[in-house]
Each structure stands twice: as C-alpha cells, then as structure tokens.
C-alpha cells in the first residue's frame, strides 16, 4: 500500500490536535512525571515509541506522533467489560510491582469502566456503566474480555438486575466508536468454547452486529493492546485486518518465520526430550509440540514481561493461543500436530461449521508439509554426519 508520508503525517497531527481540545479526565496528571516517577528515562520512552511505530508499520519519522498520541490518551474514553474469563488479559497490563510504559499508559487512559480496578459495585457499578455510555455516546472505545455463554445465558449474569453478558455487550456496543475483543476468549470463544462447549460460549463478533477488531492471545501482549489504542488515536479508523479480523500489524507473520530457533528447524536440529542436550543448546521445539508454524503473532518481536522473554525463548513450544479454537486444534500441546484427526465442537453448539472445517483441513495439510520438512532435514543432517 502506497501513501503520501507527508500528508499522512499532517493528517495525524491535525487529528491529535483536535483530540487535545477534548476534556481530559485527569488533567492534574502529567504523563512525563508519571514516567519519571517510575524510573523511565526519556531515552527509554523514545526507544519504546520507536518500537511501537515500527510495530504499527509506520516510518521511523512518525515516532514523535506516537509520543504525541500518548499525551492525549487521557482524552479517549474506554469502557472495558468482563465476560467469562480469568482476567489474564487485564493482568497483562495491570502491573503494580514493576510498572512498565504500557501499564502507565493504561493507567493514564480515560478508563471509564473496568470492574477489576473500580471501587463501585452492585447498583453503583451498573450506574457507572450506564452513565459512561450516555456521557461518551458514539465517542468511546469498547473493550471486551472473555467469551459470552449463549446456551443457557444464566451461565453468566452480572449486576443487581442479573443482566446476561450478551445483553451487556449489546448495550455497550450500540454507541461505541470502535470495538476490540481483547484476548482469545472474546475473539474466538477461548477455553469456554472448547469441546464440548457446555455453556455454548461465543466470541464477541457473534453476539453483536458491529465490526469487531480481534486482539487474541492467552493473554495478548500489553503492546498489542496499547498499540491498537494508539492506532485509533492517530488514524481514527480501524487498522488493516486479516481473515480473522486481527490487526495485520500484530498478527501478519507466523511465529515460525520470526523465531530465533528457525535456523535449527531448517537444519534438522530438534529437541527430542525436555531437558536433553539439544534443549540446552536452544534447538527447535517442533518435536516437543511447538505450534509456531501454524500461529500468527508477534510474540518473538515484542515479547512479554517488559520485553524480557516469550514462551519459546523460555524453552517451551508455542501452543498457538492466538488462533481460533486452539484448545481443540492445537492440543496435545507437547506433541506435534502431524496428520491427526482433530476432535472439536465444530459440529456442536457454537462454531461456524464451514469455516472451521475448511480451517481444520488446511491445518492438517500444513502439518503434513511441516513434518515432511522436519524429517527430510533430519535425514540430510544424519547423512552429512
């Protein structure tokens, strides 16, 4: 895609200036002071902004705009709903012991409603949600965490009036400017939708009739969450999406293609058992069940825990957590997929049968190719030795 860089820069700058004129929910807060108090230097911040600009597929010259977007983030109202989930996606951002740039930004954003961190409960919480929707009608971002039970809706009721999760989502989505499904449960159903899916848990996009941007992962990295907020702040539009409505800037490449162990895969060098000599040497984890060849995400680039590490870097294979129905299609997690039959809830309660069956067929076909490559590489290596 070709665009005029200068005009795009100017357009984003004008949009951010307009947003700056909006009322801030915490005008007494200075973002620079927040960073300074957490021991984050200007150099660290510039490095982070540069990395986020690259992650969002923006030129390095747009880094000042990324910083500018951060400064007006407290003008952007966010309503965050919890459905059937473990709160792991929120925990990906809510760190108190060692605050990161991402967690500070999350604290700085105009978070109008988030049940994990708000004081209100019961009738007061319900009123807070209603007031936030009315106050920021058509101007807020809706983020939903968790799958939504539909079989017997009373698997999930909330508030003093026992509204179902589906009812709450529909009500909040009606006046949202943009909607994000945060985590695999909200994006694709998650563990709640795993076979046999007794609660008929559904992803958000099957509950509401508005466009949903999926940000899957179990949990997604904090940068993938914050990055989408920044993108919306700068462009006022949805990012380019893949076939599963995931932002291409975050989910456009396979784990396998960007993995630091890829060279070992190509050379036929594999870990045969956890803890063996090959594991100590950092060989490929495919034979230990790594699902990197079938998974699209940017974990190897952005990593987790303040950019410290990621599952493969820590010695365990990818489990494919950002892919649809991964609990069913990617398990057992410590074994290669090969050409096995996959038992899922595809013919059951909540799945898109046609899409899921096609996806399963393609997944099995891909697995055959991966196994063939692995065996051939191993044979060549043994012959050379």
Put a short name on every predicted segment.
Residues 230, 234-303:
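A conserved mid-domain beta-alpha-beta active-site/ligand-binding segment of alpha/beta enzyme cores
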Residues 365-378:
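Alpha-helical transmembrane segments
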């Amino acid at each position: 895609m070709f665009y005029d860089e200068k005009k795009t820069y100017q357009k984003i700058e004008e949009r951010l200036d307009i947003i700056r004129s909006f009322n801030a929910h915490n005008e007494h807060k200075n973002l620079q002071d927040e960073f300074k108090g957490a021991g984050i230097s200007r150099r660290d911040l510039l490095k982070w902004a540069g990395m986020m600009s690259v992650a969002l597929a923006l030129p390095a010259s747009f880094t000042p705009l990324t910083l500018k977007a951060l400064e007006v983030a407290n003008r952007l109202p966010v309503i965050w709903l919890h459905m059937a989930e473990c709160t792991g996606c929120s925990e990906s951002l809510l760190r108190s012991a060692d605050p990161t740039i991402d967690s500070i930004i999350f604290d700085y954003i105009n978070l109008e409603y988030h049940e994990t961190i708000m004081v209100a409960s019961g009738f007061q919480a319900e009123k807070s949600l209603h007031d936030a929707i009315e106050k920021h009608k058509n101007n807020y971002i809706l983020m939903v965490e968790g799958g939504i039970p539909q079989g017997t809706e009373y698997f999930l009721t909330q508030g003093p009036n026992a509204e179902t999760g589906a009812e709450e989502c529909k009500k909040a989505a009606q006046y949202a400017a943009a909607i994000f499904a945060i985590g695999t449960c909200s994006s694709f159903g998650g563990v709640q939708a795993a076979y046999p899916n007794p609660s008929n848990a559904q992803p958000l996009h099957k509950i509401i009739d508005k466009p949903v941007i999926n940000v899957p992962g179990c949990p997604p990295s904090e940068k993938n969450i914050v990055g989408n907020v920044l993108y919306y702040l700068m462009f006022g539009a949805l990012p380019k999406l893949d076939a599963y409505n995931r932002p291409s800037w975050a989910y456009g490449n396979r784990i396998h293609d960007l993995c630091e162990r890829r060279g070992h895969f190509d050379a036929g060098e594999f870990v045969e058992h956890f803890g063996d000599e090959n594991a100590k040497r950092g060989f490929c984890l495919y034979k230990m069940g790594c699902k990197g060849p079938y998974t699209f995400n940017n974990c190897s680039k952005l990593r987790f825990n303040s950019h410290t590490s990621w599952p493969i870097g820590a010695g365990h294979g990818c489990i494919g957590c950002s892919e649809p129905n991964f609990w069913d299609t990617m398990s057992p997690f410590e074994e290669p997929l090969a050409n096995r039959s996959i038992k899922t809830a595809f013919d059951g309660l909540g799945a898109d049968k046609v899409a899921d069956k096609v996806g399963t067929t393609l997944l099995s076909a891909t697995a055959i190719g991966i196994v063939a490559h692995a065996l051939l590489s191993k044979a060549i290596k043994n012959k050379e030795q």
